[in-house]
């Protein structure tokens, strides 16, 4: 299954989760597309709940199914910590996600585009791979030729707050992942235990 590139608002309503971080997708209609009102949502089976939670997490980070599953397999090989949280930490360390967390993009999808287009540097070197795994302390910055890209400047100006696990210099347009986040600092609406249950049955 490839990465979803369709209407994000419709997908957000289907999942019951804001994919942009603004919540605007659910402000008017917080029920599934094609459903006549919020009270007609059918009850999901155990498998359905697990699948829905997996999809929520996958679409939140905008990762294709194959890459998402491979990342889960990598998480199973980490000996310390809790599997579900370790999986989420691997997602958090993706370069496109860190660019989003720093406020250099308004959405993860936009952050992925900035990385793909070569606007982003890691420790002074251009990296155009959204899945690049960021290590705490690495400096994420905007390439000199891209410092005046309107979309980047608008994103920085629109960002009202940043997570405690990142630092950012708005004048230099650079920042870093200062530490790995705690569980209560990321995606409280996700029940990663259901995602683990889903893949434990599949692998």
From Swiss-Prot:
Q: Which UniProt keywords apply?
A: Ribonucleoprotein, Ribosomal protein, RNA-binding, rRNA-binding
Which SMART domains does this UniProt record tie to the protein?
Ribosomal_S4 (SM01390), S4 (SM00363)
Gene3D superfamilies noted in UniProt = Ribosomal Protein S4 Delta 41, Chain A, domain 1 (1.10.1050.10), RNA-binding S4 domain (3.10.290.10)
Q: Which InterPro entries match?
A: Ribosomal_uS4, Ribosomal_uS4_bac-type, Ribosomal_uS4_CS, Ribosomal_uS4_N, S4_RNA-bd, S4_RNA-bd_sf
What are the GO BP annotations of this UniProt entry?
ribosomal small subunit biogenesis; translation
The molecular function GO annotations come to:
rRNA binding; structural constituent of ribosome
The signal peptide annotation in the UniProt record is none
Name of the protein in question: Small ribosomal subunit protein uS4
What organism does the record attribute this protein to?
Streptococcus gordonii (strain Challis / ATCC 35105 / BCRC 15272 / CH1 / DL1 / V288)
Taxonomically, what lineage is the organism? Bacteria, Bacillati, Bacillota, Bacilli, Lactobacillales
């Amino acid at each position: 299954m490839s990465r979803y590139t369709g209407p994000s608002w419709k997908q957000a309503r289907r999942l019951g989760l804001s994919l942009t971080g603004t919540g605007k997708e659910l402000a008017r209609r917080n029920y599934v597309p094609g459903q006549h009102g919020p009270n007609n949502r059918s009850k999901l089976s155990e498998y359905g709940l697990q699948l829905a939670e997996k999809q929520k997490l996958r679409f939140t980070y905008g990762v294709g199914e194959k890459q998402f599953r491979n990342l889960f397999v990598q998480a199973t090989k980490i000996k310390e910590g809790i599997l579900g949280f370790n999986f989420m930490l691997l997602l958090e360390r993706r370069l496109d996600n860190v660019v989003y967390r720093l406020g250099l993009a308004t959405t993860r999808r936009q952050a992925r585009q900035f990385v793909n287009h070569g606007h982003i540097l890691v420790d002074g070197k251009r990296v155009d791979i959204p899945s690049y795994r960021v290590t705490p302390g690495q400096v994420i910055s905007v390439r000199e030729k891209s410092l005046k890209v309107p979309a980047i400047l608008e994103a920085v100006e629109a960002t009202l707050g940043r997570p405690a696990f990142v630092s950012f210099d708005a004048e230099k347009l650079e920042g870093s992942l200062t530490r790995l986040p705690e569980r209560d600092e990321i995606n409280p609406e996700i029940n990663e235990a259901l995602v683990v249950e889903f893949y434990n049955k599949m692998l």
